[in-house]
């Protein structure tokens, strides 16, 4: 089902006084994974923007399951679905040492072309199709 994986490591400064990754940092991990995923699929935000195309996050749902701590390596995974005009990046992060689920997230994104909400973007439709093919 997941069509992309990225391994990362927790840095000390990402943790709060409790010694765990601060909740806001997980959004950075999720965003970095999406950007690396798009880049791996030859999709550039800069090039899209130059064409008048902007992909924007409209909402994020995150369920926190197991905390990550300084030095933990983790695997961030994703696949893409679509609901109406929204592209849904379904993302999870697993702690590498024991494969425990750290977070589960749904990132809803929309595409705006020349300032107007678009119903689709061919580059993203291809990613949805690849996700669906992997699920079958």
Regions found by a protein language model. Give the residues of each.
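Short, well-ordered turn and helix-capping elements at secondary-structure junctions
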Residues: 12-14, 60-66, 97
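HotDog/MaoC-like acyl-thioester-processing domains
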Residues: 5, 69-70, 80-136
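Hot-dog-fold acyl-thioester-processing enzymes
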Residues: 1-56, 112-136
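Hydrophobic beta-strand-centered segment that forms part of the acyl-chain substrate-binding groove
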Residues: 37-88, 104, 108-110
């Amino acid at each position: 089902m997941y069509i992309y994986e990225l391994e990362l490591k927790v840095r000390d400064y990402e943790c709060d006084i409790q010694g765990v990754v601060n909740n806001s940092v997980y959004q950075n991990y999720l965003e970095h994974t999406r950007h690396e995923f798009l880049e791996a699929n030859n999709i550039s935000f800069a090039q899209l923007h130059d064409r008048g195309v902007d992909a924007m996050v409209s909402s994020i749902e995150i369920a926190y399951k197991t905390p990550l701590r300084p030095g933990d390596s983790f695997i961030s995974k994703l696949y893409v679905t679509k609901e109406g005009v929204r592209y849904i990046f379904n993302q999870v992060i697993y702690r590498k040492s024991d494969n425990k689920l750290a977070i589960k997230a749904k990132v809803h994104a929309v595409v705006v072309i020349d300032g107007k909400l678009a119903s689709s973007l061919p580059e993203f439709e291809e990613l949805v199709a690849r996700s669906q093919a992997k699920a079958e």
